[in-house]
Amino acid sequence: MVFSSKTRGLILLLIASIVWGSTFVPQKIAMQDWSALQFTSFRFLIGGIILFSFIKFSSEKIKSNFEFLIISLLSGLVLALAALTQQIGIVTTTATNAGFYTSLYVLIVPFIGLFISKSLHWSIWPSIIVCFTGSVLLSSSGDSISLSNISNGDLWVIFSAIFWAIHLHIVSYAVLKLPIFKFSIIQFIICGFLLFIYGSIFDSQNFLNFTNVSSSGIFYLFYCSLGSVCIGFTLQMFGQRLVEATPAALIMSTEAIFAAIFAWIILSEVLNFNGLVGASLIFLGVIFVQLAPKVKI
């Protein structure tokens, strides 16, 4: 069976979403052994180094060393901020919440687009209201529905969505202009290296202390390096090159669903009624903001 390039791209993005969804659980469990800064730094360094070992098999050519370096540095920096703030949030929120709050980056993408002369579609405003309502319900405790129920961990993950949205814009440009495989490798190494330098300088006593790291902690680190970094992000790069922005964002939004499924299977995380309604509203809001601009009335 021969698939069209678009179908291949959608399959790659779906696999990436499943893999990303599966990594929220080990990201959560690994916090028993690692600090958020340690885990994020080594996760991307290891992933980048593993991929670098395959670079000799790539025939991609770099047309402009300057452009490649600048975009890779910028992408690596934004990726470091996105991954670290998300990981800090995962320490004190659930894997399920982290998955759905991360998906809010889809709402932020249009606002980032304003800086590159893209106008906002009216659908963004009802989507924000729906997702805000969903966020309050998702963080609710029992019958208590209040903004005060949104934890610091939830806020950190929501904050990370801003950087994920910026990173998506950078990647959207990079996949059209740069050799994707080499770009992926360099941005991962830059991301991990920047966090390593930061940790070594400003938190050296804790960052370089591995006495509490167990074999299971090492396993979860390597799983996230291989799964999230080597497989997930790399498939995203190649998938986005073959698929238009809207279907790509829709497919990647399913990451939240897979995160909830894996959290239920492995961690027995179960949403209460308010949580289920909230998660559904967030997902619907994310889907609506992508589909509405395509509907002709």
Predicted regions and their residues:
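Specific transmembrane alpha-helical segments of multi-pass solute transporters/efflux pumps
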Residues: 23-24, 52-102, 135-137, 219, ...
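Helix-helix packing/entry segments at the starts of transmembrane helices
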Residues: 17, 40-42, 84, 98-104, ...
